[in-house]
Amino acid sequence: NNLAYNNEITRTGKGGIIIIGGDTKTLTPGNSKADNNYIHDWSEIYQTYQPAVTLEGVGNICSHNEMENSPHEAITYKGNNHIIEYNLIHDVCLLSDDAGAIYSGRSWVWYGNVVRYNCIYNVGSENHGPDGIYLDDAVSGQKIYGNILVNIPSNSIHVGGGRDNVITNNIIVNPGNNALRFDDRSREG
């Protein structure tokens, strides 16, 4: 039950806001929120895996934030039942390839997360082609809808394995490689 609200965060050596809360065993929500923050020019020393907002645990929210000008990801989340909505994300992943402006990965059990109504544009740079929204290495049970993705150099939305992911009603303009990419890297054998 914590709130990071209406802050400007800039020139950090690492990331911006880290929210860890809730109980993954009982799925009790943390009810913490990063809302209406302006986060820019972060990760000046540690340039990867230091996002503007990190959500971990259960039932936390990242909403109405603007994030820009970073070498790597804007939002990373781990756990269940998080909501990521109404964020404006641009000019991120400027020095990264195997990444996403919004990223989660490597768990079959992180069901119930919702990524909706975000605007993501101008991701990557001339020499780097990351994804817009990247569900990596078997992350499952995600709902991705109502997002606007523009000028994403690799895959606008990339689902790297996993199951029970629902991708609907997104607007994708000028994708690089693919608007949507699904692969079976972690399919059941």
Language-model region placement:
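Right-handed parallel beta-helix
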Residues: 2-14, 28-43, 59-73, 80-94, ...
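Structural detector of coil-to-beta-strand junctions
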Residues: 15-16, 50-52, 73-74, 99-101, ...
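Asp-box/WD-like beta-propeller blade repeats and closely related beta-sheet repeat scaffolds
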Residues: 21-24
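Extended hydrophobic secondary-structure segments that form protein cores and membrane-embedded regions
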Residues: 34, 52-55, 103, 118
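Acidic, glycine- and Ser/Thr-rich low-complexity intrinsically disordered tracts
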Residues: 182-189
